[in-house]
Amino acid sequence: MYDVIIVGAGASGCFLALTLKYKNPNLKVALIEKNDKLGKKLLITGNGRCNLGNTNIMMDSYNSSSSLNSFISQLKENDYLNYLKNFGILTKKEDTSTRLYPYSNQAITVCKSFERSLEKEKVNVIYNYDVKDVTYKNDYFVINNNLRGKKVVIATGGKTYPKTGSTGMGYNILKSFGHTITKLYPSLTYLKTDYKYIKDLQGVRTDVVAKLNVNDKTILTEKGQIQFTKDSLSGICIFNLSRYVSKYLEKDKKVDVVVDLVPDYDESYINNYLKEFDSYNVSDAISCILNKKVADVITKNLKLSKIRA
């Protein structure tokens, strides 16, 4: 019989298991994981570098209707950094960024630190264990008819990246115990587009200002790098817009993403610039400012290829 069984050996599951043992070393804690190693999703965060957090935490960074003010007010950066040091994890921030990364720049460092700490604190980590059923009887929980615990914590994460094990199974378990699951929307993801020339832009990366327009009204603006793929828009600024798109599409709203490819110059400046090079082919003139692929698509889209600037 375990005092606590934690389902899911991701970041939250590992943190919880270690925190419980730090507070009470005598607790019998089990951490169960369906994969053959912990932190599988953690390994791919930050493009393999591991996102450890952000020091600029504010209420408007969250999309929940619940008030998190009391929770956020208790968060102290130094406390968190010292907490990570307990596991042997040193951190860094890049230039003016508020994002935290391991000093090694490798997510595997964080996972290995978790493994060593869990072993040191005598947490029983059970790998390749797929939870099918959780029941409650006789004042304790039973998992798959063979694991028993006084408390069970579901730390399985959401439904993103199912190849890492996040299939949404935890939601079903929670529902079976009467919990309410809020509606889920895709977030931090690319946006598919029906723009007819998108394939011609594949591979292009450039800094832009991207606006999310709903029924022709701008509701959100993001600045950053955009990446064009064969059928979609990607990049941090698009990821930040993505969480709102599904909500409005679900309401049958007209949703457009408008991209300013030259955000550092206004329209009149660009017009005057093009006039100064009126002997150029339009595509050549625009390609002095933008990626050649982008210039070609603009002139093709506007049917300007053979017209002088």
Predicted ranges, named:
Residues 2-31:
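N-terminal Rossmann-like FAD-binding beta1-loop-alpha1 element of flavoenzymes
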Residues 127-140:
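A conserved short coil-to-beta-strand element within the FAD-binding core of flavoproteins
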Residues 5-7, 32, 131, 147-166, ...:
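Short hydrophobic core segments
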Residues 21-47:
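Glycine-rich FAD pyrophosphate-binding loop
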Residues 68-76, 97-116, 161-166, 196, ...:
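Short beta-strand to alpha-helix junction loop
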Residues 52, 56, 90, 180-183, ...:
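An anion/pyrophosphate-binding glycine-rich loop and adjacent beta-alpha core
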Residues 125-129, 183-185:
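Short loop/edge segments at beta-strand edges and connector loops
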Residues 46-96:
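Glycine-rich active-site loop/strand segments that organize a redox cofactor
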